[in-house]
Curated annotation (Swiss-Prot):
<protein>
    <recommendedName>
        <fullName>Bifunctional purine biosynthesis protein PurH</fullName>
        <ecNumber>2.1.2.3</ecNumber>
        <ecNumber>3.5.4.10</ecNumber>
    </recommendedName>
</protein>
<keyword id="KW-0378">Hydrolase</keyword>
<dbReference type="GO" id="GO:0006189">
    <property type="term" value="P:'de novo' IMP biosynthetic process"/>
</dbReference>
<dbReference type="InterPro" id="IPR011607">
    <property type="entry name" value="MGS-like_dom"/>
</dbReference>
<dbReference type="Pfam" id="PF01808">
    <property type="entry name" value="AICARFT_IMPCHas"/>
</dbReference>
<dbReference type="InterPro" id="IPR036914">
    <property type="entry name" value="MGS-like_dom_sf"/>
</dbReference>
<dbReference type="InterPro" id="IPR024051">
    <property type="entry name" value="AICAR_Tfase_dup_dom_sf"/>
</dbReference>
<keyword id="KW-0808">Transferase</keyword>
<dbReference type="InterPro" id="IPR002695">
    <property type="entry name" value="PurH-like"/>
</dbReference>
<feature type="domain" description="MGS-like">
    <location>
        <begin position="1"/>
        <end position="144"/>
    </location>
</feature>
<comment type="pathway">
    <text>Purine metabolism; IMP biosynthesis via de novo pathway; 5-formamido-1-(5-phospho-D-ribosyl)imidazole-4-carboxamide from 5-amino-1-(5-phospho-D-ribosyl)imidazole-4-carboxamide (10-formyl THF route): step 1/1.</text>
</comment>
<comment type="pathway">
    <text>Purine metabolism; IMP biosynthesis via de novo pathway; IMP from 5-formamido-1-(5-phospho-D-ribosyl)imidazole-4-carboxamide: step 1/1.</text>
</comment>
<dbReference type="GO" id="GO:0004643">
    <property type="term" value="F:phosphoribosylaminoimidazolecarboxamide formyltransferase activity"/>
</dbReference>
<dbReference type="InterPro" id="IPR016193">
    <property type="entry name" value="Cytidine_deaminase-like"/>
</dbReference>
<comment type="similarity">
    <text>Belongs to the PurH family.</text>
</comment>
<dbReference type="GO" id="GO:0003937">
    <property type="term" value="F:IMP cyclohydrolase activity"/>
</dbReference>
<dbReference type="GO" id="GO:0005829">
    <property type="term" value="C:cytosol"/>
</dbReference>
C-alpha cells in the first residue's frame, strides 16, 4: 500500500483530496488539526507518532523531523542500498506529500502583530517535508497548492501514479514556494533589526496575470504583485468598467498615482501621458480642477490617464466623457457619474482607497543588465521655510505657493524637466530633453500667452548655465524655483537680478529617469 503524508494549514478541499487518495489505495499519515479534520470526515488516518514512535515535543515545534519520515521520503527507490536500509530500520516509503505552510505572511499583515507571534508562525517541519519530497521527485509526488489536487488525483486514477513530468513540475513549484516563504521571513526579520543594506537581497512577488503583451506587441509580459501588497497601488484598484489594463496602462496609472499623492489639500486632477504629466489642475471643486487640467494641454490629454483625488461627480464626468481617455482612477464615482462614463465601452474606470495614500513607501527597483538598482522613493516633502531666496527680488506669498505646486509637478516629470505653472494649473511641461534649455523652451512655448505675473518656472535640477533664466525672463517669467548647486549659480543669479526675477534655491534635486 502506498503512503501519503498530509499536513495543511489551509484545509480547502482537503477531505475530498484525501478521500480520493484512499480510494486509489493510499494510506494517510497525518498530524494535528489536519488529522482531526480527516478523522471527523470519516477518512481513516494514522498519526505521525505511530510512524515515528516518538511524541510531538516543544509545544508542537517538533513533529515530523524524524528519520522515519524523512528516510521514507528521501530513499531512492532504484537504489538497492537505500531500500535495504529502509527495510533494516523498518522504515516504510512515503510516496506523496501534501503540505502547505504556516500563514506567516498573513500573520505579519495584521496591524497589531508582535514579533513573538510572527516567529511562532515560521514553519520549520513543513518546508523540510516539502524540500525532501521535492528533492526525490523521481519517486515522490509533492503537493503544496490546493489547485493541483484535481490533477494529481486524475493522473493517479488513470495511470496508478503521477507522471514524472508532473512530479518535476510540482517539485519546481515547491522550491519556488519555499524560496518565497523564506524571502518574506528574511525581509520581515531584516526590517525588524533595521538593516538597510543586507548582503543578500531576497525579493518575492506573486503572479497576478499574464499580460497580452508588453510595452510593444512583440514583447511578452507578466504582472507580479508584491508578496505583501500595498493598499495604495494600481494593483489594488477595483476595476469598475472597461477592458483589462495593458502593460503601458499600468505604468502610466502608477505614475499618475505617485503624482496625485502629492496633492491632498485641494481637489486636483492629474493627466498623465507616457509617464509625464501633460496637465495638472486644482480648484475649489473637482469640475474646476478638471477644467484646468484639460486647459493645460487639451491636445496631449487625448488618450491620457487621469487621476483625481476626489470622488467623481456628474458634472466632472460629463466633461471627461467628451474626450477619449484610457483610464480614470479616483477614490470613487457617484452613481450618475458612473452611468455617464460607462457609456464608453473601452474606458477603464478604477476605484482605489485613497485613505492609504500616506502609507510608507517601499524602495524602487530598476533592472540593469546583470543586476538591479534599488533606491528609496523620492517622497521628500519640501518646506518653504527651508528655501533660500538668492535674488534681490523677493517672492510673494502667492508665488511661493505656486512654486510649491510647480515643484510637485516637476518632481514627476522626466529629466531634464521644466514646468511652468500658475497657482491653478500647469501651463507648460518640458520633459526628457538631453539639455535643460530645450526643456525650458518647450515648457515656455506650451505655456504661450498664459504666462502672466502669476507664472513661475520650476526645474528638477540646477541650471548649468544662465541661459534658462534669461530665456524665461525674456518670456515673462517673474519667479523661478530650482535646487541650486551649480558652480555657475552666480551667473544665473546675476541674470535673474538683471531682469528683476525672484529666484529660490530649495537645496534638493528631483531627477526622474
Amino acid at each position: 500500500m502506498k503512503r501519503a503524508l498530509i499536513s495543511v494549514s489551509d484545509k480547502t478541499n482537503l477531505v475530498d483530496f484525501a478521500k480520493g487518495l484512499v480510494q486509489n489505495g493510499y494510506e494517510i499519515i497525518s498530524t494535528g488539526g489536519t488529522k482531526k479534520t480527516l478523522d471527523e470526515a470519516g477518512v481513516k488516518t494514522i498519526s505521525v507518532e505511530e510512524v515515528t514512535n516518538f511524541p510531538e515535543i516543544l509545544d508542537g515545534r517538533v513533529k515530523t523531523l524524524n528519520p522515519y519520515i524523512h528516510g521514507g521520503l528521501l530513499a531512492k527507490r532504484d537504489d538497492l542500498e537505500h531500500m535495504a536500509t529502509l527495510e533494516k530500520l523498518n522504515i516504510k516509503p512515503i510516496d506523496l506529500v501534501c503540505v502547505n505552510l504556516y500563514p506567516f505572511k498573513q500573520t505579519i499583515e495584521k496591524p497589531d502583530v508582535t514579533t513573538e507571534e510572527a516567529i511562532e508562525n515560521i514553519d520549520i517541519g513543513g518546508p523540510s517535508l516539502l524540500r525532501a519530497a521535492s528533492k526525490n521527485y523521481q519517486d515522490v509526488t509533492v503537493v503544496t497548492d490546493k489547485n493541483d489536487y484535481d490533477l494529481v488525483l486524475k493522473e493517479i486514477a488513470e495511470k496508478g501514479n503521477t507522471t514524472l513530468e508532473t512530479r518535476a513540475k510540482l517539485a519546481a513549484k515547491v522550491f519556488r514556494a519555499t524560496a518565497a516563504y523564506d524571502a518574506v521571513i528574511a525581509n520581515y526579520l531584516t526590517k525588524q533589526v533595521g538593516l538597510e543594506d543586507p548582503e543578500k537581497l531576497t525579493l518575492t512577488y506573486d503572479l497576478k496575470e499574464k499580460m497580452r503583451y508588453g510595452e510593444n506587441s512583440h514583447q511578452k509580459a507578466w504582472l507580479y504583485e508584491d508578496a505583501i501588497p500595498k493598499s495604495f497601488s494600481i494593483l489594488q484598484a477595483h476595476q469598475l468598467h472597461g477592458k483589462k489594463l495593458s502593460y503601458n496602462n499600468i505604468k502610466d496609472a502608477d505614475e499618475a498615482l505617485r503624482c496625485i499623492r502629492e496633492f491632498q489639500d485641494e481637489p486636483t486632477v492629474v493627466a498623465m501621458k507616457h509617464m509625464n504629466p501633460c496637465g495638472i489642475g486644482r480648484g475649489d471643486t473637482l469640475e474646476e480642477a478638471w477644467d484646468r487640467a484639460y486647459e493645460a494641454d487639451s491636445v496631449s490629454i487625448f488618450g491620457g490617464v487621469i487621476a483625481l483625488n476626489r470622488k467623481v461627480d456628474l458634472a466632472t464626468a460629463k466633461k471627461m466623457h467628451k474626450i477619449f481617455l484610457e483610464i480614470i482612477i479616483a477614490p470613487g464615482f457617484d452613481d450618475d457619474a458612473l452611468e455617464v462614463l460607462e457609456k464608453k465601452k473601452n474606458i477603464r474606470l478604477l476605484k482605489l482607497d485613497f485613505s492609504k495614500e500616506n502609507e510608507p513607501t517601499r524602495p524602487e527597483i530598476v533592472s540593469v543588465m546583470g543586476g538591479i538598482l534599488q533606491q528609496e522613493q523620492d517622497t521628500l516633502v519640501e518646506n518653504t521655510d527651508d528655501w533660500k531666496v538668492v535674488t534681490n527680488a523677493q517672492p510673494t506669498e502667492a508665488q511661493l505657493k505656486t512654486m510649491m505646486f510647480a515643484l510637485k509637478a516637476v518632481k514627476h516629470t522626466k529629466s531634464n524637466a521644466i514646468v511652468v505653472a500658475n497657482d491653478e494649473r500647469t501651463l507648460g511641461v518640458g520633459a526628457g530633453q538631453p539639455n535643460r534649455i530645450d526643456s525650458a523652451k518647450i515648457a515656455i512655448k506650451h505655456a504661450g500667452d498664459a504666462i502672466d505675473d502669476r507664472a513661475v518656472l520650476s526645474s528638477d535640477a540646477f541650471f548649468p548655465f544662465n541661459d534658462c533664466v534669461e530665456y524665461a525672463a525674456k518670456h515673462g517669467i517673474k519667479a523661478i524655483v530650482q535646487p541650486g548647486g551649480s558652480i555657475r549659480d552666480k551667473d544665473s543669479i546675476e541674470i535673474a537680478d538683471k531682469y528683476g526675477v525672484a529666484m529660490v534655491f530649495t537645496g534638493y534635486r528631483h531627477f526622474r529617469h
